[in-house]
Design a protein with these regions (language model features):
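Acidic, polar low-complexity linker/tail segments
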Residues: 1-13
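A charged nuclease-like catalytic/ligand-binding cleft shared by nucleic-acid processing domains
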Residues: 11-25, 36-138, 177, 183-197
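Short hydrophobic alpha-helical runs that function as membrane-insertion/retention elements
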Residues: 136-140, 165-167
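Acidic, metal-binding active-site segment of PIN/NYN-like and related structure-specific nucleases
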Residues: 139-148, 152-155
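Eukaryote-biased recognition of electropositive, low-complexity segments
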Residues: 155-157, 162-199
Length: 199
């Protein structure tokens, strides 16, 4: 069901799996709300900064490690509207960047017509969690879909305690065999919204 390339891939110790369409929508909502609140234009989110913030929230620390970033998106969408860089094929897929947290390798994965979006997300998550090499998984699903959240909880129930799994959501979720972080903090950082502006 999943792209054969993913099954054969050598996975890094650290993997970020994100529903790119959902993350883009949340970024848009934050831009609209905070522009009104703080009275200034907010630029597109910095993709590298957002990935760094997710990695830090997921427990990554400075070092020379490698992290794979899998952006799952609708086949109909060629780019994210509220991020820079944003084009899945020309600017993100197969690209990498390095900083004090190591190297980040980005893959964009369009949802094929033969599979439902939630099923594909769950398949990728389950496959990544089965890999012995993977030690840390950061998951950004569309948490507005209750059935998907239940299925993620079920999928992660049997994951080895040696793996550190963090699920990012806009509000706290019902607990499970994973840590939780609030997605909004990493997005606000990537959008350049400073804490002092919110006072």
């Amino acid at each position: 069901m999943i792209d054969e390339k993913l099954n054969k891939e050598k996975w890094s110790e650290n993997v970020i799996i994100a529903d790119a369409d959902y993350v883009d929508k949340v970024a848009f909502d934050l831009i609209v709300n905070f522009e009104r609140m703080i009275g200034r234009r907010i630029p597109q989110a910095d993709m590298a900064r957002w990935i760094d913030c997710v990695a830090l929230d997921g427990g990554l620390r400075e070092g020379s490690q490698e992290t794979q970033v899998v952006l799952i998106h609708s086949k109909k969408r060629t780019a994210m509207d509220n991020f820079s860089p944003s084009d899945f094929e020309s600017q993100l897929n197969g690209k990498a960047f390095s900083d004090n947290l190591g190297e980040f390798i980005i893959s964009s994965l369009p949802i094929e017509d033969v599979v439902a979006a939630d099923d594909m997300f769950l398949d990728v998550l389950a496959m990544v969690c089965r890999q012995d090499d993977v030690k840390r998984v950061m998951v950004i699903p569309d948490t507005s879909r209750d059935a998907l959240c239940d299925n993620i909880r079920h999928t992660l129930r049997t994951v080895s305690d040696e793996k550190r799994v963090t699920v990012f959501a806009m509000q706290p979720m019902q607990g499970g065999n994973f840590r939780q972080e609030i997605l909004g903090y990493s997005l606000m950082n990537a959008l350049g919204i400073r804490a002092e502006e919110l006072k």
